[in-house]
Amino acid sequence: MKNIFTGIFLLVSACFMQAQTPNYYRNPDKIYLDSKEGHNGSFTWQMHKADETKDPAEKISQPGYQTGKWMPAIVPGTVLNSLVHNKMYPEPYYGMNNKLDRNIIPDLAKTGREFYTYWFRTEFDVPENYKDKIVWLQVDGINYRAEIWVNGYLLGNMSGMFKPEYINIDILRFEHA
């Protein structure tokens, strides 16, 4: 009788472990712009506080823009994720770090949204084997508002928490051809 309970327990444990295994499936027909920092992705993302950036969006979003002293960014992730990664603030989910009355991590309600408004940028190439495909940029990590700029063009605005948005960037591929 003891062996039956052990067998059932092991079966149930295996089911729970399987249920908690994250799904890392990546569609081979897509390019994922995950950052090297934090996600071991293939792309170098950088960020800079918007009100400290004097250049216009048309220039910042151009290939080859010199970022100078921009910080590494975690993508997908939030502004706060990247600020914590860069040791600007402590981990909010540790101890009492995020408690309002401690004033360790600035609260948006007190600072205003400009405080957490940053430029995020990376550069990527559309592979040659995408030549006969329509190319979409899928953005699904925005929290809370963003303008999407590519190659000097404003392609869209979005707002909401982490909702996916799909932007056709196919026309830009042929701009410099």
Report the location of each language-model feature.
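Accessory carbohydrate-binding/adhesion or oligomerization-edge regions at the termini
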Residues: A19-L100
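Generic structural signal for beta-strand residues in well-ordered domains
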Residues: F9, G38, P63, E128-Y130, ...
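Accessory beta-strand-rich segments of carbohydrate-active enzymes
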Residues: T21-K30, H48-E52, N86, E91-P92, ...
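Low-complexity, intrinsically disordered/propeptide-like segments
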Residues: I8, S13-A14, K36, L83-N86, ...
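Short glycine/proline-rich turn/loop motifs
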Residues: N98-A109
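Bacterial Sec-dependent N-terminal signal peptides
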Residues: M1-P22
